[in-house]
Structures are given as structure tokens and as C-alpha cells.
């Protein structure tokens, strides 16, 4: 389903953003 693909993209982007925030906090 298209919405599942979009959901995966959003989750992947959110995970990437969260990871960037965590790395920034640790640095």
C-alpha cells in the first residue's frame, strides 16, 4: 500500500533526525 511506503519514509526520516539530535547532544 502507498500509505505504508509513505509511513516508512516518515519513520526513517524521523529516526534520522532523532539520531542527529542525540549525536549533537553527545558532542
From Swiss-Prot:
Lineage top rank: taxon: Eukaryota
Biological process annotations from GO: defense response to bacterium; defense response to fungus; killing of cells of another organism
Main subcellular location: secreted
Subcellular location: Secreted
Keywords on record: Amphibian defense peptide, Antibiotic, Antimicrobial, Cytolysis, Fungicide, Hemolysis, Pharmaceutical, Secreted
Transmembrane segments: none
Tissue spec. comment: Expressed by the skin glands.
GO cellular component: extracellular region
Self-association and partners: Monomer and oligomer. Forms aggregates in aqueous environments.
Family label: Belongs to the frog skin active peptide (FSAP) family. Dermaseptin subfamily.
Function: Potent antimicrobial peptide with activity against bacteria and protozoa. Also has activity against fungi. Also shows activity against enveloped herpes simplex virus type 1. Probably acts by disturbing membrane functions with its amphipathic structure. Binds to healthy erythrocytes (this binding is receptor independent), and has strong hemolytic activity. Does not bind to P.falciparum infected erythrocytes, but accumulates within the parasite. Kills the parasite, and only at high concentrations has a hemolytic activity on the host cell. In vitro, shows high spermicidal activities.
Entry protein name: Dermaseptin-S4
Organism from which the protein derives: Phyllomedusa sauvagei
